[in-house]
A protein has these predicted regions:
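Conserved glycine-rich cofactor-binding loop
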Residues: 11-12
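Substrate-binding pocket helix/loop in short-chain dehydrogenase/reductase
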Residues: 90-91, 98-103, 129, 185, ...
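Active-site helix of classical SDR
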Residues: 114, 150, 158
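Alpha-helical segment proximal to the catalytic Tyr-Lys
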Residues: 119, 163-164, 225
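Residue(s) in the substrate-gating loop at a strand-loop-helix junction
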Residues: 134
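Short C-terminal tail/terminal secondary-structure segment
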Residues: 139-142, 217, 228-241
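A conserved structural motif in NAD(P)-dependent oxidoreductases
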Residues: 201-212, 223
């Protein structure tokens, strides 16, 4: 029977690529989303992947979402925490809600999701948790104190939970993408991309969502049990942690 994989933020951008790649690798995939019903319905129609809507910043919503996924598909063995938002501005202009929204969605969601799957994983003595952090959680970024703090927190969370899960067959790893060719990044002015961003990347190009997805498929595999507590930098050489 195929293992069940749940991807938060799994219907757009990097998350959509992850959902598609896991399905292609033979997993029974559930893709969480939190915003556009129309976009999620289109994704489901194109891929055949089941979609589930809930707010990952709410513990109760995550509990209900996990319960529904497991009732319909079976126990969740692979969790990919990919959902995230930005509310960029310099700290001296940042409103409290811009801080809390990013922290609660990007970092709080890891507790909300992991807490609701970890007991089942421990009972079954198997689990793969993969957290999508960011290069900006490693190096920081101007105008992103909230986002950088949350993404750095994801790395710390990963290392701590990896120690707790190691003896019961649960691996926990983080992936830190750099600039990836999502719709959001590709919408940037070409002049900004060509003059300000690409020169910082030694390989001279943006990453592709599918490249991150392939990393996830590897870390999710049954035979990837040696890898836990790791932070995989996928940034084309832009930053070395």
């Amino acid at each position: 029977m195929a293992r069940v994989a749940l991807v938060t933020g799994g219907t757009r951008g990097i998350g959509a690529a992850i959902s598609r790649a896991l399905k292609a690798a033979g997993y029974n995939v559930a893709a969480n989303y939190g915003s556009s019903d129309e976009a999620a319905a289109k994704f489901k129609a194109e891929t055949g992947i089941n979609v589930y809507k809930w707010d990952v910043s709410s513990f109760d919503a995550c509990a209900a979402g996990v319960k529904k996924v497991e009732a319909e598909l079976g126990p969740i063995d692979i969790l990919v925490n990919n959902a995230g938002i930005t509310r960029d501005t310099q700290l001296h202009r940042m409103k409290p809600e811009q801080w809390t929204e990013v922290i609660n969605t990007n970092l709080g969601s890891l507790f909300n999701m992991c807490r609701n799957v970890i007991e089942g994983m421990r009972e079954r003595k198997f689990g793969r948790i993969i957290n999508i952090s960011s290069i900006n959680g490693q190096k920081g970024q101007f105008g992103q104190t909230n986002y950088s703090a949350a993404k750095a927190g994801e790395i710390g969370f990963t290392k701590a939970l990896a120690q707790e899960g190691a003896r019961v067959g649960i691996t926990v790893n983080a992936i830190c993408p750099g600039y990836i060719a999502t719709d959001m990044v590709k919408a940037m002015p070409q002049e900004v991309l060509q003059k300000n961003i690409l020169p910082q990347i030694p390989i001279g190009r943006l990453g592709e969502p599918e490249e991150i997805a392939r990393c996830v498929v590897f870390l999710a595999a049954d035979d990837a049990g040696l890898f836990t507590g790791a932070t995989l930098s996928a940034n084309g050489g832009q930053y070395y942690a």
